[in-house]
Amino acid sequence: MLTLKLISEETERVIKGLEKKHFEGAREAVEKVLEYDKIRREAQQKLDSNKQQQNQLAKQIGSLMKEGKKEEAENIKTTVADLKAADKALQEIMDKAQADMTHVLLDIPNIPNKDVPEGKDASSNVVIKEDLTNMPQLGDEALCHWDLLKKYNLVDFDLGVKITGAGFPVYIGKMARFQRALEAFFLDEARKSGYLEIQPPYVVNEASGLGTGQLPDKEGQMYHANLDNLFLIPTAEVPVTNIFRDEILDEKDLPIKRCAYSACFRREAGSYGKDVRGLNRLHQCDKVEIVRIDTPEHSYQSWHEMLDHVEGLLKKLELPYHLLLLCGGDMSFTSSICVDFETYSAAQHRWLEVSSVSNFESYQANRLHCRYRHSEDKKIELCHTLNGSALALPRIVATILENNQTPQGIRVPKVLVPYCGFEYLDDKND
């Protein structure tokens, strides 16, 4: 959530930032916030004035009673009663203005960092780095991953439909072990980089969804347990970041680095055409998330370190990849800046997103009331929050399957062999 201070002091910059993000009605939304704030402040001033007047009148009543001027004192008591009645009305005005202002603020996205390119959609994203060292050269008979999964009996999509519905695959034999190997590898690499592992709940309350910005923006894409008003998590970012909701951290303890594996659940409402085939787009997937909490001065250093971490994983998995700096119109609701990592899927002849690494600056922290205390002057300030996928499994698996297919089976990247205990993914389960 944008701070009221930022909106009040840098109104035009905020409006231009929202327009860069292609947020419709940017000026109107900002003007609503300022109008509700004006109503709230005016009511507060009147309330403060009333309180001051009541204190003065209370002293007069005391003096008059001592002097025996009871009738005059009673008249003043009537005035005090009227002021107290006015106080109640003013408090109601303040509360309503605050609620209305918060409602509008929750629907306003974050503004982009100055380095974010202009653009409305993915066509304006900018490739800022690429490594094609491991680009495979496959023949015309190369199979897409969904055909490979069927050939080697590694995933049963029909069984998932029987048990739950489309988008909930069942992993079998070596593929189940391969999934577990990837999760362990990603977590171990995060631990080596200084991240403390968390095993979070997969279900969160409404306050947690609001805190990280999935609510109200992404409510339609989340699975909602209506009876208990709980939500299945779309990413471990939600429970892990909410650990620090309503906390005041010490500057000396920053940056805070956490990682977590979780299953992730997304309704993914809408039609995506070819994107839905195989593992390209699922309702349930597995992912390791890295989260950092830092000071405003150091958050971009943290962000670059997170980019380096994700890039290191892709190198170790021997995959071709590139980094996309997202344009304003293609960024998430909460991001200030975001880089997507995509790997090349050789049989599909397309790039697949496998990670997003974002700096939210103070946007999430303002919703979360996540703050830190300066070591020297003890001043309390909003933290910056960051997160990234390190990595998301389904599309990583898809690219490994397609890029590493051989007549003997799917060659397992060398770094994963110690984790899964075999060198090829095939139908020979031992």
Regions found by a protein language model. Give the residues of each.
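N-terminal alpha-helical targeting/anchoring segments
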Residues: 1-134, 154, 158
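TRNA-recognition modules of translation machinery and tRNA-sensing kinases, especially anticodon-binding
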Residues: 27, 130-430
